[in-house]
Amino acid sequence: MKPTYQDALAYFGVSGAHPGGLTLTKFLLEQEKITEETTILDGGCGTGQTAAYIKKNYPCSVTGIDYHPTMVKRANKRFEKEHISIQLVQGSLEKMPFPSDSFDIILVESVLIFTNCKNSLAEIKRVLKPGGVLLLVEMTAERALYAMEHQNMCEVYGIEKVYTEKEWINLMKEAGFPKVEVTLGHSVFSHMMTGMEPEDEAIDTSVPVNMQLEGKLMDHSYILYTYGNIIGYRVYRASL
């Protein structure tokens, strides 16, 4: 089985592997009302960077879930090192081991596109409490892609589709979210001009050299610089 882009992120321990990184995450959280009663799920928590930040800066309950076993190990290691207690589950957004109506806020950063989006959104809606909020940061096509453009991106990331803003909104509405807002968004190139530099994107240099996985990260860079004017990201806020 060929290694995936996600395998590369896990192997090298890349944190904040989404546009804007932790800087953007902090901004999004500041817009929400978070109290001691708030329950937050970091969906696709990766190395645990976001979950750890929330736990250390807000008085709420935090849970993390990630499908990749290496990411779960890295997240646990982070939580132990930083002496914080966070419930962490290895599992898929498509079928989460949580009761219905469990969370007030679910934060998903550049993860949903790697799953069956319809199944994941249905599960997210199930585990959100009435009045709950989904904060979604996702790769978004600036226009309908040509066949070759779409194929190249899907092959690099191992995904089935790159959605436009309208398609993302339709997916969320079809999943039962009556209100979907786009609160922020840029193409890759226009984002570079904002000065919103991501925090802590350093890779784990202690792991052995793996040229195949390094190649996956290089493929990612190629996509960004080749198609940076036609792909980007959007922040979607979907509420129940």
Model regions and ranges:
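A short glycine-rich, Lys/Arg-flanked "PGG" loop and its adjoining helix->strand segment in the class I
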Residues: K118-V133
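Short alpha-helix
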Residues: E160-G176
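Conserved Class I S-adenosyl-L-methionine
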Residues: V182-L240
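A short acidic, Gly/Pro-enriched loop at the edge of an enzyme's catalytic core
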Residues: E94-I105
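Conserved alpha-helix/loop element of class I SAM-dependent methyltransferases that forms part
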Residues: H18-E36
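Short, glycine-/aromatic-enriched active-site segment of Class I SAM-dependent methyltransferases
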Residues: F12, M139-I159
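Class I SAM-dependent methyltransferase SAM/SAH-binding core
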Residues: L41, T47-K95
